[in-house]
Amino acid sequence: MTNIIRQFLRQEAAGGLILIIAAAIALLMANSALQGIYQSFLDIPVSIKIASLDISKPLLLWINDGLMAVFFLVVGLEVKRELMEGSLAGRDKAVFPAIAALGGMLAPALIYLLFNGADEVTRQGWAIPAATDIAFALGVMALLGNRVPTGLKVFLLALAIIDDLGVIIIIALFYTQQVSLQSLGIAAAAIALLAYMNWRGVGKTSAYLLVGLVLWVCILKSGVHATLAGVIVGFMIPLHTQDQRSPSESLEHGLHPWVAYLILPLFAFANAGVSLQGVSLSGLTSLLPMGIATGLFIGKPLGIFTFSWLAVKLGIAKLPDAINFKQIFAVSVLCGIGFTMSIFIASLAFEGTDIALTTYSKLGILLGSTTAAVVGYSLLRLVLPARRKAVNVR
C-alpha cells in the first residue's frame, strides 16, 4: 500500500471519531436549552456577489452544497484511481458496486411502499430510504482504522457515489418542481471543457478547479444537487501526466486533512441536530417512520447483498481483491445510514403537507440510520482481520 493511502487511512480513523462526536454534540444541542443557539448558527446568512452573480444562502446550505462538493471531489479522485489501477480495475470488478447500488435503491423503496403504499400522501416518500449518507457511512467505517482493506472502503465509496447519483436523478425526475435548462446547458459545456482538458493532457490542477467552480455554480442554479460537480471534477483530473506527475494524487493528498478534520465534522454538526420535541410513542411506531427505518436497516442490506451475490454467481461481476461476502454484508448494513440525504428527500416529499410527516420521517431516518451504524460497525469488527501492527525497520 502506498504512503498516501496509509496516511489517508490514519486521517480518517481520527476524523471518523471527530465526526461521531460532532454529531452527538449537535443532537444534544438540538434537544436542550441550546437549541436556539444551534439553529441561529445554521441560519447565519452568507452571500457571494460577483457582477451579476448573486448566491445568498444560510450557512447550513453552504456546508451541504459547497463544502460537501469538496468532499465529493476527493471521493471522485480516489474512486477514479481504484477504477484505473486499483481494486476496481477491470469491467467485471467495476460493475460490481453499480449492481450492488441498484439493489440498494430498489429494495428499500419497495419495503417502504409495503408500509405506506396505500396512503396517497405518505406514498410520496418512497425514495427516502433509498439514499446512503456517504459521509457518515465512511466516518463509521473509519473508526476501524487500518483494519479495513482498501478494496472494501473503495467498494463503499463507489457504491455510495452511484447511489447518490441515482438519488440525484430521482430528485430531478420526481421531486424537483423547476429545473433551469439554461444552467444545465452551461453545466454541460463546462463538463465538455473538462473532458477536453483531460484528453489534451492538461496537468494544471488550478485549471480544472476553476472550470469546476463554474460547473458547481451552474448545477446549483439548475436545481440539481450541487455536490455532483465535485464527483465530475474528481473524475476529470488526470491520474498521470506525460512527465509522470500525478495531479490527482497531489490534490487528494492536499485536501484530505481538510476533509477529515474540518469538512466532515462540520457537516455532521450541521445536519445531526434532529429535534425530538413533541414525539409520541404511537407516532414513532406508525407506518411512516417504521417504513423508513425498516427500509434503511433491512432493505439496504437485503438489496445490496442479494444483488451482489447474484452478480458474482451469475458471472456478471467479480468481488474486489481480498474481499469476501461476509465483509460485503457488513458494509451493506452500514449503507443503511441514510441520514442527511434521506432527510433532504423527506423535506422535498412532504413539502407543503402536515409538518408532523416531516418530523416523523426524520425520526424514522434517525432510528434506521443509527441502528444500521451500530450493527454495521459491530459486524465489521467481527469480520475484518486483526489490526495490523506497525513494523520498525532498522
Swiss-Prot record:
Short name of one Pfam family: Na_H_antiport_1
Keyword Transferase: no
TM annotation in the entry: 14-34, 59-79, 95-115, 125-145, 154-174, 179-199, 213-233, 254-274, 292-312, 328-348, 363-383
Assigned GO CC terms: plasma membrane
Keyword Transport: yes
InterPro entries: Na/H_antiporter_dom_sf, NhaA
Catalytic activity: Na(+)(in) + 2 H(+)(out) = Na(+)(out) + 2 H(+)(in)
Any single GO BP term: regulation of pH
MF annotations from Gene Ontology: sodium:proton antiporter activity
Membrane topology: Multi-pass membrane protein
Protein localization: Cell inner membrane
Predominant cellular place of this UniProt entry's protein: membrane
Keywords for the protein's UniProt record, in alphabetical order: Antiport, Cell inner membrane, Cell membrane, Ion transport, Membrane, Sodium, Sodium transport, Transmembrane, Transmembrane helix, Transport
Family (UniProt): Belongs to the NhaA Na(+)/H(+) (TC 2.A.33) antiporter family.
Function (record text): Na(+)/H(+) antiporter that extrudes sodium in exchange for external protons.
Name of the protein in question: Na(+)/H(+) antiporter NhaA
